[in-house]
């Protein structure tokens, strides 16, 4: 959903669009709630309130004030992520395909021969980080840039088995135009760029679990963040490999040698960060022209010093000369050395060239060892070739994708490796490594042990659901880690599957009730965005690839009206209510009937079931940004800070009734997941509320009327307005509450319209108009620890006879209250009051 705010209406008609005019009779919160539950994708919000826009954005719903038709046309035709704190729109707009154009935010790609392999008549355009170079295209009242690029497709091609780039891109662009992409995939980089700076302002130690190549630029500015990944491939791991020969396989049609060099250096940088938590100087020997340096320096300020007879235009200092082992003394501490020396074969005889390459490999290794031998805080990445070698067993082997699989690989060394045991590795084993292993990640840090880190803030995005983690340990971590943002895959199945297949792995599935967190917010991706100054124009779809975002230790936990709130809670029910049942009251009708309340007169007004809880349960797949458990808990401890909106405090029994309705809904739908979720939420309600039932009552509150429009043969027909189980010394407390509630009780608009047989031999009249007051007085009794009400639903009625009688229907008739009293069952009236 996107909310586009306008001061005046527009003449154009847009598809999937609704107009909402600000209602001045309601406050900003109520207007925001009503907008959020509209069913179309685009909302044109007229006569808008700035406060309402703020509320929507904090809820993760993109809402922005527009000043021109051009702004409207741009935003209505695509999705976007909105930084509502800095007033920046990041478009996810692929309409540039209509210019026969693909886009990249990686400069090195523009220096390759990729355009030879594009679709006929197409071109490649560089747009800068997150589309920063496109800002000049939009002369708007807010900052705007198009963050959409095709880098994800280009990188996917590089790691795929496909060789024909044109066919690959054609297929992927067609998929992009027809298949639902997770919106989080498009906006994740914007999110990470907001998330980590804000965390580092508040927390000294930040730990990040499971970073992937998509984040390889994001963390360059944060050397102190400790990364956990899948670990490195070590020299000692080659013992598992069988010997092989040279394979010679082309990976990419266009030259990706620069990409390989960039990944090697980035791997070395993050390895250095892990050891020393600071930025290094970067020395590079060979690898000219290294256009990728532009990309790295565009993201973060690094000092590069390079040696190569060829130009390296983006280096800080370039020496247009060869580098020899005697030059190592020129290199400073606190640095990285990247050695990428290899002579081109040219027309040389193969055997002669092979001998040269092996000599250069030994020379490269000597330079690396000499560099690491003295000084401190050093890491070296050196180019190697498959040959018989003695190597430190703890050295890291790298084989990032390059244009062709031939005989090269890279060795990552630190000063400790220099002193470690060396092992003879045959050439055939190294060929086996080259032929079969691709380094898929620039982050090669050790795996995360799933345990609490008391002195750190843990970020684990899309990293802990894998079934190689122990599920109970993941739950234990989330329950006990005081400060964290952790995601787990939500259980979107209908058969309550404990794990689901995803790509080539299995993931555990979770529901919010699997966790027993303390002061944690459990929400969706869009709900989480709102907590960090972002909102998005499209909520996550229930694809099966959805995650719960669990934030522990946030200072926003008690801000119930601002973050992870109840906006959009009824949107799904509004979208489907006109399908088979063809009535806007279908949800109300089902909820009442499923709790054996058959009086449906005024069912949309007299609610006996919490609609919030009911919708949050049965449609949790469509809106889990609303943190239901937090909402229940804060109500149970009376710490709900209501900032606005139409607020009605629910009695705990109304929450229970909602769970029962949801369970019946789940049974009818054969939805085992909703069934379990509803049961567990009901158990949770019973845990946080101390609900007691007057199923064996000894007192009741009665209401006597001046007029009863039916025949009756009981002595005094009355409405039993609830039963109590109390000791005699609690009677004064009950009387005090009745006195406090007197005005509200006598103001009830009570009506009746028919009679019916409640059961065999019990003839009653229906009563409408009392439920809201009943639940209010229930809450007052509950807070005073007085047992009021039974476990079954309260069905208001007046007993007319203890004989079977014919039912009667009359015009709706108002009942005038004569008196309200408290009486002991099978005893005397102990209190009576009149208006």
Curated annotation (Swiss-Prot):
Its EC number is 3.1.4.-, 2.7.7.50, 2.1.1.56. The active site is at residues 718, 720, 797, 799. The keyword Nucleotide-binding applies. GO terms for molecular function: GTP binding; mRNA 5'-cap (guanine-N7-)-methyltransferase activity; mRNA guanylyltransferase activity; phosphoric diester hydrolase activity; RNA binding. Residues 556-693 are annotated as: GTase/RTPase activity. Residues 171-245, 429-555 are annotated as: N7-methyltransferase activity. Contains a bipartite N7-methyltransferase domain, a 2'-O-methyltransferase domain and a GTase/RTPase domain. The C-terminus contains a phosphodiesterase domain that degrades the 5'-triphosphorylated, 2'-5' linked adenylate oligomers produced by the host cell in response to IFN stimulation. Interacts with VP1. Interacts with VP2. Belongs to the rotavirus VP3 family. This is Protein VP3. It comes from Rotavirus A (isolate RVA/Monkey/South Africa/SA11-H96/1958/G3P5B[2]).
């Amino acid at each position: 959903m996107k909310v586009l705010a306008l001061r005046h209406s527009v003449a154009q008609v847009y598809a999937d669009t609704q107009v909402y005019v600000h209602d001045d009779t309601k406050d900003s919160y109520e207007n925001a709630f009503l907008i959020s539950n509209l069913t179309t994708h685009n909302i044109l919000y007229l006569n808008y309130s700035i406060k309402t826009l703020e509320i929507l954005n904090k809820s993760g719903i993109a809402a922005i004030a527009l000043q021109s038709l051009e702004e409207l046309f741009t935003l209505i035709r695509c999705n976007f992520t909105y930084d509502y704190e800095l007033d920046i729109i990041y478009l996810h707009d692929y309409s540039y395909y209509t210019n026969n154009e693909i886009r990249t935010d990686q400069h090195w790609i523009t220096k390759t021969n990729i355009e030879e392999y594009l679709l006929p008549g197409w071109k490649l355009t560089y747009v800068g980080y997150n589309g920063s170079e496109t800002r000049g295209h939009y002369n708007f009242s807010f900052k705007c840039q198009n963050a959409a690029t095709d880098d994800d497709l280009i990188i996917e091609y590089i790691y795929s088995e496909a060789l024909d780039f044109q066919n690959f891109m054609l297929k992927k662009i067609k998929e992009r135009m027809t298949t639902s992409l997770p919106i989080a995939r498009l906006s994740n980089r914007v999110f990470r760029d907001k998330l980590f700076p804000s965390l580092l302002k508040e927390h000294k130690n930040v730990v990040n679990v499971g970073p992937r190549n998509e984040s390889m630029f994001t963390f360059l500015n944060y050397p102190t963040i400790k990364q956990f990944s899948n670990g490195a491939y070590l020299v000692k791991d080659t013992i598992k490999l069988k010997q092989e020969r040279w394979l010679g396989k082309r990976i990419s049609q266009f030259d990706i040698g620069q990409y390989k060099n960039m990944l090697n250096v980035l791997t070395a940088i993050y390895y250095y960060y892990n050891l020393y938590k600071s930025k290094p100087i970067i020395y590079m020997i060979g690898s000219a022209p290294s256009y990728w340096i532009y990309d790295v320096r565009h993201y973060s300020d690094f000092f590069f010093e390079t040696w190569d007879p060829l130009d390296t235009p983006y280096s800080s200092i370039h020496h247009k000369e060869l580098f020899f082992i005697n030059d190592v003394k020129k290199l400073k501490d606190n640095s990285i050395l990247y050695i990428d020396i290899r002579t081109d074969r040219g027309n040389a005889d193969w055997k002669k060239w092979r001998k040269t390459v092996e000599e250069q490999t030994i020379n490269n290794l000597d330079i690396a060892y000499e560099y690491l031998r003295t000084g401190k805080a050093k890491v070296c990445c050196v180019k190697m070739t498959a040959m018989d070698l003695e190597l430190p067993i703890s050295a890291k082997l790298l084989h990032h994708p390059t244009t062709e699989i031939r005989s090269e690989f890279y060795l990552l060394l630190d000063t400790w490796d220099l002193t470690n045991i060396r092992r003879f590795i045959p050439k055939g084993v190294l060929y086996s490594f080259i032929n079969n292993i691709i380094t898929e990640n620039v982050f090669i840090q050790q795996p995360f042990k799933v345990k609490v880190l008391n002195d750190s803030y843990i970020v684990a995005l899309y990293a802990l659901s894998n079934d190689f983690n122990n599920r109970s340990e993941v739950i234990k971590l989330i329950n006990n880690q005081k400060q964290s943002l952790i995601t787990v895959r939500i259980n979107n199945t209908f058969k309550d599957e404990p794990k689901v297949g995803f790509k080539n792995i299995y993931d555990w599935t979770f529901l919010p009730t699997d966790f027993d967190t303390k002061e944690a917010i459990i929400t969706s991706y869009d709900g989480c965005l709102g907590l960090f100054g972002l909102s998005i124009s499209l909520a996550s779809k229930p694809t099966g690839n959805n995650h719960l975002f669990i934030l522990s230790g946030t200072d926003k936990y008690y801000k119930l009206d601002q973050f992870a709130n109840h906006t959009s809670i009824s949107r799904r029910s509004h979208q489907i209510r006109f399908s088979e049942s063809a009535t806007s009251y279908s949800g109300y009708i089902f909820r009442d009937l499923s709790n054996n309340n058959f009086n449906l007169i005024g069912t949309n007004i007299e609610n006996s079931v919490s609609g919030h809880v009911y919708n949050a349960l049965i449609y949790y797949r469509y809106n889990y940004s609303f943190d239901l458990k937090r909402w229940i808990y804060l109500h149970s401890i009376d710490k709900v800070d209501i900032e606005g909106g139409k607020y009605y405090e629910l009695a705990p029994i109304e929450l229970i009734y909602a769970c029962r309705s949801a369970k019946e809904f789940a049974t009818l739908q054969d939805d085992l997941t909703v069934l379990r979720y509803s049961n567990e939420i009901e158990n949770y309600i019973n845990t946080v509320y101390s609900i007691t039932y007057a199923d064996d009552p000894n007192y009741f509150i009665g209401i006597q009327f001046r007029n009863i429009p039916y025949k009756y043969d009981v002595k005094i027909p009355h409405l039993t307005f609830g039963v109590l189980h109390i000791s005699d010394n609690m009677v004064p407390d009950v009387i005090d509450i009745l006195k406090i509630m007197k005005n509200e009780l006598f103001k009830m608009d009570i009506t009746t319209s028919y009679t019916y047989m409640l059961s065999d031999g019990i003839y009653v009249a229906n009563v409408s108009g009392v439920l809201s007051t009943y639940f209010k007085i229930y809450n007052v009794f509950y807070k005073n620890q007085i047992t009021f009400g039974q476990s079954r639903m309260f069905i208001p009625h007046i007993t007319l006879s203890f004989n079977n009688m014919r039912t009667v229907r009359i015009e709706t008739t108002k009942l005038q209250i004569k008196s309200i009293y408290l009486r002991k069952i099978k005893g005397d009236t102990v209190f009576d009051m009149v208006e």
